[in-house]
Amino acid sequence: MASLLTALILPLALLLLDAAKVLGSLSFRMSPTQKETRLGEKVELQCELLQSGMATGCSWLRHIPGDDPRPTFLMYLSAQRVKLAEGLDPRHISGAKVSGTKFQLTLSSFLQEDQGYYFCSVVSNSILYFSNFVPVFLPAKPATTPAMRPSSAAPTSAPQTRSVSPRSEVCRTSAGSAVDTSRLDFACNIYIWAPLVGTCGVLLLSLVITGICYRRNRRRVCKCPRPVVRQGGKPNLSEKYV
């Protein structure tokens, strides 16, 4: 009868869960409030009713994080009996009424699938009360980072202030030393000729652009033939160009 009653009130419990959290926090004391355990460890959770005469029995439930928001009924505890949900192994999960207002749930050997949020609920005067959630989980796995492979090269003691090209070192002479002209080959000449060639190229391009613009803007002279009027009043056809 108790399991049937619990199955009927579970849908209603989901709708009233948020509203009952305030009442539940004032009506229950959970011990511990959270639990971080390990595989194979024994886990004991206690639910204490703070209001005397609130109820004679208590139901334990578990909510597993995931897509399904419905909690899972685990057991119903009273002074007379312990009613486990179908499919649960009594050697793995058990419960008992410790005192008049304390109800205990015990997991003999914690498993991976036992992780979740545990809570208890009671019905008193047609009111459904829920306790706070007790998270029971395994320790979080630390994020593994790949180990850095040690470098085979020995670290340099003196840091370099700036990078200098080896070609520029060939063309540079130290202060007070004689200049060795035999070493000034093409590697040094390119530092001299490259800016000069670039400058000449820019000047030549500017000259070409200036010439093109001048030819386009030059004033056109009309070369149309016209007769020349002589003093006699008639044009001379032999002299028709000016």
Curated annotation (Swiss-Prot):
> Where, in residue ranges, is this chain on the Extracellular side?
26-189
Q: Where is the signal peptide?
A: 1-25
Supply the alphabetized keyword list.
Adaptive immunity, Cell membrane, Disulfide bond, Glycoprotein, Immunity, Immunoglobulin domain, Lipoprotein, Membrane, Palmitate, Signal, Transmembrane, Transmembrane helix
- Check the record and name the PROSITE patterns matching this protein: IG_LIKE
The residue ranges of the Ig-like V-type domain are 26-140
> How does the record classify its membrane topology?
Single-pass type I membrane protein
Q: Which residues lie on this side of the membrane: Cytoplasmic?
A: 215-242
PTM entry text = Palmitoylated, but association with CD8B seems to be more important for the enrichment of CD8A in lipid rafts. O-glycosylated.
Q: Which Pfam families match?
A: V-set (PF07686)
Q: Give the intrachain disulfide bonds.
A: 47-120
Q: What segment(s) does the record annotate as region Disordered?
A: 147-166
Outline what the protein does. Integral membrane glycoprotein that plays an essential role in the immune response and serves multiple functions in responses against both external and internal offenses. In T-cells, functions primarily as a coreceptor for MHC class I molecule:peptide complex. The antigens presented by class I peptides are derived from cytosolic proteins while class II derived from extracellular proteins. Interacts simultaneously with the T-cell receptor (TCR) and the MHC class I proteins presented by antigen presenting cells (APCs). In turn, recruits the Src kinase LCK to the vicinity of the TCR-CD3 complex.
Report quaternary structure and partners: Forms disulfide-linked heterodimers with CD8B at the cell surface. Also forms homodimers in several cell types including NK-cells or peripheral blood T-lymphocytes. Interacts with the MHC class I HLA-A/B2M dimer. Interacts with LCK in a zinc-dependent manner.
The record ties this protein, via PANTHER family, to: CD8 ALPHA CHAIN, T-CELL SURFACE GLYCOPROTEIN CD8 ALPHA CHAIN
User: What is the name of the protein in this document?
Assistant: T-cell surface glycoprotein CD8 alpha chain
The organism of origin for this protein: Bos taurus
